[in-house]
């Protein structure tokens, strides 16, 4: 009796399935445990998957478009800047609020409404640039069958973030969630963001200085911290070096100059209705500084922003005697809204000197299209450490394997 042969197509599918299972990579991300309900300012490193208006990028993450521009030191004085079209492949820092959810730090304030031809893999890998995996979206939304995704479904997009008490080596810091690209090395990432290999390894609980495409690192950016009273609604405001941030309902703009630790706030240029910004018992307005040279030194008087409470802008008059009078206030340079992405930013890896061990210090940074963090002084020690979690590096592979299993099962049924 002749033994039925297996269909050649079934054998082909089995081989592809085996190879897919063998070579599916595993991406790592840093998890920060938490037990309180406090929040912090954090950043997402996001690369545009297509040309998008500033307002469209803001809609993807449900954040203020002006805040995105200021976080990247882009000049907001240009006409109709919120509708400026940003080029595909542009890297942006997206400001978000990092919360404590189910015992770990993450942001769950982003929702995405599905469109025709969407699947969890394309949403994770393309729309959100690998900041989340298909499996994480599936779990967050209790999706039983990923292949049955109705158009118009609102999905929670759990995004990675870290707080680590807003410090790095006891200095103010904001943490950027950065998706590693194929061209990246840990040394190059450290150099780009003005930190050290040791610091990155400590923060991300890494045993070796090895990274793979799709890994998500928590990168500490040097920052300027506020000292607002706890009752202020913007208590804990912290701004990374080279960036700006809005406060008090678009009334106040705060900045952190490159290499600085001093937060400077002044009235914002936006046309909004604001409460008084004059300091009590003086004729100084928010952001004003007066100096008077004396034989004992320089008397400096400043009208500082002290947060907002119940809709009232809080100001504080500060007087100090300094050895010498300060120079003009320094600001991070503002960039014109970008229309193109330089080729070297799109394709060139971050500068990568030879690695001499975990204690190596990355040399002075070279800025990319948009400014990174400022310079962290000295060698880090005992930095914050998260834990490592793993997830499928390719959501597309996840659904491709599911598809192949279905085909294989169907072929078996036909051959039986």
From Swiss-Prot:
Disulfide bonds join 34-100, 40-163, 98-161, 100-163, 224-256, 251-279. GO terms for cellular component: extracellular region; nucleus; plasma membrane; side of membrane. It comes from Arabidopsis thaliana (Mouse-ear cress). Residues 1-27 form the signal peptide. This is LysM domain-containing GPI-anchored protein 1. GO terms for molecular function: peptidoglycan binding. Keywords: Cell membrane, Disulfide bond, Glycoprotein, GPI-anchor, Lipoprotein, Membrane, Plant defense, Repeat, Secreted, Signal. It holds the Pfam family LysM. PANTHER family: LYSM DOMAIN-CONTAINING GPI-ANCHORED PROTEIN 1, LYSM DOMAIN-CONTAINING GPI-ANCHORED PROTEIN 2. The keyword Metal-binding does not apply. Coiled coil: none annotated. Gene3D superfamilies: LysM domain. GO terms for biological process: defense response; immune response. Disruption phenotype: Impaired sensitivity to peptidoglycans (PGNs) leading to higher susceptibility to infection with virulent Pseudomonas syringae pv. tomato DC3000. Residues 356-376 are annotated as: Disordered. Residues 110-157, 176-219 form the LysM domain. Residues 392-416 form a propeptide. A lipid is attached at residue 391 (GPI-anchor amidated alanine). It comes from the Eukaryota. Required as a cell surface receptor for peptidoglycan (PGN) elicitor signaling leading to innate immunity. Plays an essential role in detecting PGNs and restricting bacterial growth (of Pseudomonas syringae pv. tomato DC3000 for example). Interacts with peptidoglycans. SMART domains: LysM. Glycans are attached at residues 37, 165, 241, 288, 299, 310. SUPFAM superfamilies: LysM domain.
């Amino acid at each position: 009796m002749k033994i039925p042969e297996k269909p050649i197509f079934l054998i082909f599918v089995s081989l592809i399935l085996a190879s897919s299972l063998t070579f599916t990579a595993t991406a790592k991300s840093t998890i920060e445990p938490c037990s309180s309900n406090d929040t912090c300012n954090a950043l997402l490193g996001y690369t545009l998957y297509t040309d998008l208006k500033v307002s469209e990028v803001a809609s993807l993450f449900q954040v203020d478009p002006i805040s995105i521009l200021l976080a990247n030191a882009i000049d907001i004085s240009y006409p109709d800047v919120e509708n400026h079209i940003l080029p595909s492949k542009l890297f942006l820092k997206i400001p978000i609020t990092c919360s404590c959810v189910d015992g770990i730090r993450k942001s769950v304030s982003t929702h995405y409404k599905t469109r025709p031809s969407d699947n969890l893999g394309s949403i994770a890998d393309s729309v959100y640039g690998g900041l989340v995996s298909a499996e994480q979206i599936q779990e967050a939304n209790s999706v039983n069958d990923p292949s049955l995704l109705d158009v118009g479904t609102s999905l929670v997009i759990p995004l990675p973030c870290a707080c680590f008490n807003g410090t790095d080596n006891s200095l103010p810091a904001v943490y950027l969630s950065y998706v590693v690209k194929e061209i990246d090395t840990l040394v190059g990432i450290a150099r780009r963001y003005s930190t050290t290999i040791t610091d990155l390894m400590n923060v991300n609980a890494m045993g070796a200085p090895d990274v793979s495409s799709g890994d998500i690192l928590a990168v500490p950016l040097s920052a300027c911290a506020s000292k607002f009273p706890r009752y202020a609604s913007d208590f804990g405001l912290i701004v990374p070096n080279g960036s700006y941030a809005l406060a008090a309902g678009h009334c106040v703009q705060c900045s952190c100059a490159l290499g600085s630790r001093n937060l400077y706030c002044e009235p914002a240029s936006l046309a909004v209705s604001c409460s008084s910004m004059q300091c009590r018992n003086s004729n100084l307005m928010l952001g004003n500084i007066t100096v008077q040279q004396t034989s004992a030194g320089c008397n400096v008087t400043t009208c500082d922003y002290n947060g907002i409470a119940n809709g009232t802008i809080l100001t504080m008059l500060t007087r100090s005697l300094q050895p010498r009078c300060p120079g003009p206030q320094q600001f991070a340079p503002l960039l014109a809204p970008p229309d193109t992405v330089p080729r070297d930013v799109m394709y060139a890896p971050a500068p990568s000197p030879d690695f001499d061990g975990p204690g190596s210090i990355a040399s002075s940074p070279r800025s990319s299209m948009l400014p990174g963090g400022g310079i962290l002084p000295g060698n880090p020690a005992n930095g914050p450490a998260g834990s490592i979690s793993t997830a499928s590096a390719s959501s597309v592979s996840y659904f491709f394997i599911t598809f192949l299993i279905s085909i294989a099962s169907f072929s078996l049924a036909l051959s039986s």
